[in-house]
Amino acid sequence: MNFAGPTKYLRVPVRRVLDVGCGIGLWKGIVERHFPGASYQGVEFSPYLCERFGWQQGSVVDYAASEPFDWVICQGVLPYLNPADVKAALHNLGRLSKGALYVEAVAREDYEQDIIDEDLTDNRVFRHRAELYRRGLREGFVELGGGVWLSRQAEVPMFALEHVGG
């Protein structure tokens, strides 16, 4: 999936990108390719990775920025959080994004439907229901599908079929 497609289609300008839980920065090159000239801010919980790659240390639960970002990426982070921290993180993502959000998180239903290859997946995660994620994100976002959410701050007019539940 071209994660940048929805924002380009909806004409959401992308100048600042936040990758929260960035790890080794796999998204940095993708962001540079899809959004030339946009600044990339990596935030990571691991002090080692921050020192090695120059990221800012922080957590999706309580990371604060001076102003919201146009694109926020949160891949593979939320399942490691307990339920209370997930709720706080989802609320915080709403504060951090004024444009779009890409979220990737395994859910309990993925395990129940045997979609997860447990030999290749870290099983030291909480198996939150997908509805927990959706309910928390709906507060600040409209679901576009494919893990992409549009901030309610974006004030982008959309036709009913352009978003989930429209």
What do the PLM-derived regions correspond to, one by one?
Residues 73:
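A conserved beta-strand element that flanks and buttresses the S-adenosyl-L-methionine
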